């Protein structure tokens, strides 16, 4: 009954590990989407799209949205984070692929070893049964020989008794 619980728990733990391995990608994706939306707002400020009555701010005043260098720096930071996460995931993939290959080889070796052990066990059992059969046949032949000897001695004794009775009946 506890077997299925163990399998279920193991499956949940494996799922959690997979999801936690991709947290960096999820965070990078969220940041990229935020930057993209911020970049679109910044582009509206720079191009002057929007309401015609909105005045373009003077050169001394800062824009309400982030500046282009800030957006560019944030995008570069996110790109480097995404590349770092990608390289980590690639390294993890390589590591897991290597481990998978090792496990496959080990599984193949274990299967062969199990087959060899089963064959040896079968041969041992066969040898044991043959030995028991030989011992039973020897016992049977010994008992038959003893039985024949007993019958021969009994027949000889009965024959002597019959002759003795015959000899005794001649004089009566």
UniProtKB/Swiss-Prot annotation:
Annotated family: Belongs to the ATG16 family.
Gene designation: atg16
Main location: membrane
Keyword terms, alphabetized: Autophagy, Coiled coil, Membrane, Protein transport, Transport
Cellular-component GO terms for this entry: phagophore assembly site membrane
Coiled-coil parts of chain: 70-153
Entries under Pfam families matching the protein: ATG16
Gene Ontology BP term (one): autophagy
Topology relative to the membrane: Peripheral membrane protein
Location within or outside the cell: Preautophagosomal structure membrane
Top-level taxonomic group: Eukaryota
Function: Stabilizes the atg5-atg12 conjugate which is necessary for autophagy. The atg5-atg12/atg16 complex is required for efficient promotion of ATG8-conjugation to phosphatidylethanolamine and ATG8 localization to the pre-autophagosomal structure (PAS). Also recruits atg3 to the PAS. Involved in endoplasmic reticulum-specific autophagic process and is essential for the survival of cells subjected to severe ER stress.
Name of the featured protein: Autophagy protein 16
Quaternary context: Homodimer. Part of the atg5-atg12/atg16 complex. Several units of each may be present in this complex.
């Amino acid at each position: 009954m506890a077997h299925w619980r163990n399998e279920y728990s193991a499956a949940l733990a494996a799922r959690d590990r997979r999801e936690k391995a991709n947290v960096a990608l999820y965070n990078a994706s969220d940041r990229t989407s935020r930057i993209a939306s911020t970049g679109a707002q910044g582009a509206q400020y720079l191009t002057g799209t929007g309401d015609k009555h909105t005045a373009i701010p003077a050169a001394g005043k800062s824009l309400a949205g982030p500046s282009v260098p800030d957006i560019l720096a944030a995008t570069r930071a996110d790109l480097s984070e995404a590349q770092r996460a990608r390289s980590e995931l690639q390294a993890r993939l390589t590591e897991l692929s290597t481990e998978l290959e090792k496990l496959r080889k080990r599984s193949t070796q274990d299967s062969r070893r199990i087959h060899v052990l089963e064959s040896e066990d079968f041969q041992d059992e066969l040898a044991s049964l043959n030995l028991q059969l030989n011992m039973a046949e020897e016992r049977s032949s010994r008992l038959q020989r003893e039985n024949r000897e007993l019958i021969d001695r009994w027949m000889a004794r009965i024959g002597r008794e019959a002759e003795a009775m015959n000899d005794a009946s001649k004089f009566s």
